[in-house]
Amino acid sequence: MSVIHTNEKIQPQSLDSWDQRKITIVSDAWHPQVNGVVRTVEATAVALRELDHQVQILNPSEFLTVPCPMYPEIRLSLDVWPRVGKLLEEFCPDSILIATEGPLGIAARNYCISKGLKFTTNFNTKFPEYIRLRVPIPERWSYKYFQWFHNPSESVLVPTESLATYLHERGIKNTGWWSRGVDIDLFRPYDESILQDLPRPISLYVGRISVEKNVNAFLDLDIPGTKVLVGNGPAMDKLKSDYPEAIFVGEKHGQELAQYYSAGDVLVFPSTTDTFGLVLLEALACGTPVAAYPVCGPVDVIKDNHVGILDNDLQKAVIAAIGLSSDDCRNYASNFSWRNCAASLLSNLSNNRSVWN
């Protein structure tokens, strides 16, 4: 994998010079899920269309679905064969991105292999680690499946260099780079604080409230002020009972979510299993510094200690991050755009145009 920093800007003229393409993105993750995969696919598709590319998104809303046993909000598509192949044949995409490893992803992968079509995959979630937290299955067993799934692709796209290294060590080697972005017009500092009546400083958590996000590490911190959690998930009821002093506000979206980011004095990111963490960019764009562990994701995003603090002692990181410059955070986040994200994707997609002709 060639090293490209995630905040490297891509010149507009290089975008405009590319041929118009028909691109299919296959994603088992879709609304009503609220996660980085859905936001990345959706925002990238918008940016690609703004560049005059045609984008088809194959997602569970077009299929019969059942809830995933461990994640009921994730819908697993049932009637994928032969419908996925027929939908691809109707659209005749120049490039195919398989964004997830679920039933839709498997159907698209197998169809491409059977027809000799080149395809690109995306690794966005450390499901082997998530599975290990719930059932006693060794990660190496789960990674055998991911090797099978990803290794036939032309390239396995990852958002960071550290994730590429992580996957190389687990037998997935053909990695490429697909960056991430943030809407700096939506995520920006807001004048009025919706949390103005709470004791300061306000330490903010934004994300899924579940075991794999390590939320307890945040709630157990002995820090001054107020802890506010934005999000929902299977661990929410228990954590609300165990930590009555914390404020749980549920899921927030759009401008209201941005106002919560802006109201915080620090975003605390306790996860050690994420592959990137879009919430890091969203908080920084709102002028809120970050405190996190020095792990995959944060070490790639928070390259400048003027915008966040990484420490194995999360309490030290939180205390040190409070008071960092909001302007520095905002300026740093402005380097990450969805237009650049679309550009990095385009540079890694294979061309099947001759196959359909």
What is each PLM-predicted segment?
Residues 195-230:
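Conserved donor-binding/catalytic core segment of Leloir-type glycosyltransferases
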Residues 118-120, 129-148, 158:
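Nucleotide-sugar donor phosphate/pyrophosphate-binding loop at the beta->alpha transition
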Residues 237-255:
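Nucleotide-activated donor-binding/catalytic signature segment of Leloir-type glycosyltransferases, i.e.
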Residues 323-357:
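A charged, aromatic-enriched C-terminal amphipathic alpha-helix characteristic of glycosyltransferases
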Residues 144-190:
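Donor nucleotide-sugar binding/catalytic pocket of nucleotide-sugar-dependent glycosyltransferases
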Residues 272:
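Aromatic "clamp/platform" in nucleotide-sugar-dependent glycosyltransferases that forms part
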Residues 289-292:
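Short hydrophobic beta-strand element within catalytic cores of glycosyltransferases
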Residues 150, 251, 259-264, 345:
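Short alpha-helical donor nucleotide-sugar binding micro-motif in glycosyltransferases
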